[in-house]
Amino acid sequence: MTTLTQPSALPASAKAGPEMDALAPFYRDWRWTGRIEANGMGPGSPEMTGTGLASCRLIQDGLWYDCDFRQEQRLTDGRFVLTWQLHWLTGWDARSGEYRACSADNNGPTLEIYRGRIEGTRLVYESLNEGLPRIRLTWILDGPEHATWRNEYTLDGEAWTLIEEYAMEATQAAPEA
């Protein structure tokens, strides 16, 4: 009969902590409407409207949120401009001691990495790169079923300019506490 000796330190998978619970109200399935500022999509770009959907799910035993965003952008007279798509992955990075996210979209295409923090009812991410310009993404909870989402940029590292802002409505029940 063979007896296996247990090593003193077996590897173990990471476990989701309270930081992931704190993200739950922000990462739901949403639909939204809003507007893109003139010059928001680059110099000379017109004001536009946007309507979109987000679908988010927990993956890897609750360690990460995996989200897909899709938005139709139109001129203010209703003419179609483009369909924006973005894939978003976020969670608590224990090594850095902060929220981290990465995104890939079809408008650059760009692959970006962000650092995040929760400030009360606000979830704020800023581009991790130290160079300029930088992006800031903010989710603001306006109640159990509503939020505002803002996208801003800075050219100097101090003053932030609004690119776009949306009123969001949850399309699924609130997470249980």
Model-identified regions with their sequence ranges:
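Hydrophobic small-molecule pocket/channel-lining residues, especially in calycin-type beta-barrels
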Residues: M1-A177
